[in-house]
Amino acid sequence: MTTDQPKLEPIDPRTAQQLYLDHKRTECTESTVRNHKYHTNYLVEWCEENGVDNLNELTGRDLQEIRLWRKEVGDINLLTLNNHMSTLRVFLKWAGSIEAVPENLYDKVMVPRVAPEDEQADETLDGDRAQEILEYLSTFEYALVEHVLFGILWEAGLRIGAVRALDVDDVAFEEERLELVHRPDQGTTLKNGPGGERLVVVFR
């Protein structure tokens, strides 16, 4: 019985990574490309440490070992591991399209689920962490509610209630600003009432 699986073409991990990043540059911002490079560097490092010089050789068991290894060497939290494994899954799906790995190998990447409580913390969010979150959202949840909400919260330093009070007409794209308006009759209020109304520059 024959199958329709295409024949794999040998390619070393570092060359595959470079081709992948060149591909991402045609459709993503440079910051997103840097994020993908950072995440896939760990795959290349693991392959070099384990003598995998042909990406064709990767197996589902290897992917599990990579997941455990990444958690161990970086002592990273669940959200960061989720980001790394999600990028690996995207990379392997692309790799399958160029006959570098089996087409369905990306399905074997185990991406950990992140519960809402794991996304919350008491400490202040620093700039590097915020950038990592923004890059993840721009890659995997582009223009969805979570992406837009987090971007405005971080860039403008607003309360969630203030962001919820925004209407479409409050966004001035040409002036690159938001206008916060207290509208109690419409159910979109500001914490300080009319005293909280102001203009906020958010676009960079």
Regions found by a protein language model. Give the residues of each.
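Amphipathic alpha-helical recognition patches that constitute DNA-binding helices
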Residues: T32, T80-N83, V148, E197-V201
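Short, flexible, mixed-charge acidic loops at enzyme active sites
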Residues: P10-I11, D107, E123, R177-Q186
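Basic, Lys/Arg- and aromatic-enriched nucleic-acid-binding interface segment
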Residues: G127-I160, R164, P184, G195
